[in-house]
Amino acid sequence: MRCLGIDYGTRRIGLAYGDELGVATPLPALVEADPAKRWQSLLATARQRRVTDLVVGHPLNMDDTAGPKAKEAEAVAARLRTELAGVDVHLVDERLTSYEAEATISKTQRRAVRASGVIDSRAATLILQDFLDQRFPPPLPHPAE
């Protein structure tokens, strides 16, 4: 299993990679200004890494409803299923991952870092790690004898 985590946005696409070892690692975000080039870079990354699973963040509202951003993620997932036939595409709840990722960066650096896509890739890492943790739960400790 080779997974690509995706935090899809209209300006940047955060990426992360993980496999059966169960550890998600951030990749450089796609920050091209042209959305078509950004999309092509996403497809190229998936092909180069020969991913078997794409894990797309699904930003549901706090009340579990799907707002405009969630519907956009659903459309992205559908497009990926079409353009990368044979690759499994999963939608994973990503509520608060961007907030959590941003919280790891000092307030004075957030504005500069945001444009680089670092926050987006950290969010993608959190999304993918959640998926991997569900697939490969950590082993239970052995009881002391």
Swiss-Prot record:
Principal location: cytoplasm
Enzyme Commission number(s) of this protein: 3.1.-.-
CDD domains: YqgF
GO cellular component, one term: cytosol
Entry annotated with the keyword Cytoplasm: yes
A single MF term (Gene Ontology): nuclease activity
This protein's UniProt keywords: Cytoplasm, Hydrolase, Nuclease, Ribosome biogenesis
SUPFAM superfamilies: Ribonuclease H-like
GO BP annotations listed: rRNA 5'-end processing
Enzyme category, top tier: hydrolase
Compartments in which it is found: Cytoplasm
Sequence similarity: Belongs to the YqgF nuclease family.
Function, in words: Could be a nuclease involved in processing of the 5'-end of pre-16S rRNA.
Name by which UniProt lists this protein: Putative pre-16S rRNA nuclease
Species this chain originates from: Opitutus terrae (strain DSM 11246 / JCM 15787 / PB90-1)
